[in-house]
Amino acid sequence: MVKYSREPSNLTRSAKAYGAYLRVHFKNTYETATAIKGMLVKDAKRYLNDVIDRKRCVPFRKFRGGVGRCAQAKAFKHTQGRWPEKSCKFLLDLLKNLESNAEVKGLEQSKLRLEHVQVNRAPVGRRRSYRAHGRIIPFLSHPCHVELIAVEDEDHVPRHTPTEKKVVKMNKRELARMRLRTGRALS
């Protein structure tokens, strides 16, 4: 059994999935996972498929050094973005596993929301590359561990809006500023 970094807010109405030592770039997976955090599972799957088809991009916020700009990142109020296909495929597999775990628990698929998404670094895979003049340089891979927790959304009761008009109290300065702005006196 895997130890998760945190427990879900509601144990009975949640599902978990974990991927360990995944041979996919840590930085790309981190940015992709951050992009789907808080989404409904069905929306996250649609988004990841759009990234694979290059219809939408993954905004690179933290690990953005040397990342080119793309117009699709404007949807996230950002300028830099990429389309990390391998990370998307790994996350899609984990989301599929998460849905299966939720189905076993009897949770409703359409209400699953990704509450917790975390990507951790795994130990570096070390290889070597042979260069000219007898030199040897390291050839490293940076795998990662990914954990997902989805919670079934509860039906929210709409907030009550008061019918009475609220009396706004203002001091002299605020009242004078309001008069200047509107151009008339308030009674």
UniProtKB/Swiss-Prot annotation:
The keyword Ribosomal protein applies. GO terms for biological process: cytoplasmic translation. One of its GO terms (molecular function) is structural constituent of ribosome. Keywords: Ribonucleoprotein, Ribosomal protein. SUPFAM superfamilies: Ribosomal protein L22. Pfam families: Ribosomal_L22 (PF00237). Gene3D superfamilies: Ribosomal protein L22/L17. It comes from the Eukaryota. GO terms for cellular component: cytosolic large ribosomal subunit. PANTHER family: 60S RIBOSOMAL PROTEIN L17. Belongs to the universal ribosomal protein uL22 family. This is Large ribosomal subunit protein uL22. It comes from Theileria annulata.
